[in-house]
Amino acid sequence: MALEQTRDGDVVIVSWNDGENRYRGDSVAEWHEGLDEVEATDGPLALVVTGTGKFFSNGLDLDWMSAHPDESGDMLRGVHRLLGRMLVMNLYTVGAINGHAFAGGAMLTCGFDERIMREDRGYWCLPEVDLGLPLTPGMYATVAARLPQATLHDSIVTGRRYGGAEALVAGIVEHIAAEADVLPLA
């Protein structure tokens, strides 16, 4: 399984460990199963989500979508549902952004109540403009729910890559930290 759940007291930590952590049919289903487990847990909880290696998430797996056209629509609906679930979860959510968060990975970070990004490496980016892919209404709603208006416009229209310090100034994240401190701070 690409998602590993651990628990530290009242905090559930989900680590996504699948290379570039891209959304495919199986990974989206695994996300929903994992969130079902978290939501079924008794007691007060917080949820921390992180990636592994140099990637938080690089978003949709476009190669998988091209190879599985009959399943791509369901997978994309599953991603929309995931983004919506994260926005309204009935527990505090924190993104421990360990590395690159691009496209759907950047959108996922906008579902968290709080975001902590590595200060020295990794970019947060919505590159859809460079790929010629428009944001769906659900994707737009997710990023619009969390980003300041000027940052929302800049990130969508230009595809700008924000490093940790720039993401902090732009209001994308609330905190930046050294690599070793991102998860503990979360």
Predicted segment positions?
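Conserved CoA-thioester-binding segment of acyl-CoA-metabolizing enzymes
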Residues: 1-52, 84
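Short helix- or helix-capping micro-motifs
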Residues: 58-60, 143, 151-160
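Glycine-rich beta-to-alpha active-site loop
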Residues: 83-131
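Amphipathic alpha-helical segments at domain termini/boundaries
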Residues: 1-19, 158-186
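Hydrophobic/aromatic residues within transmembrane alpha-helices
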Residues: 49, 108-110, 167
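Glycine- (often His-adjacent) and acidic-residue-rich active-site loop
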Residues: 4, 51-85
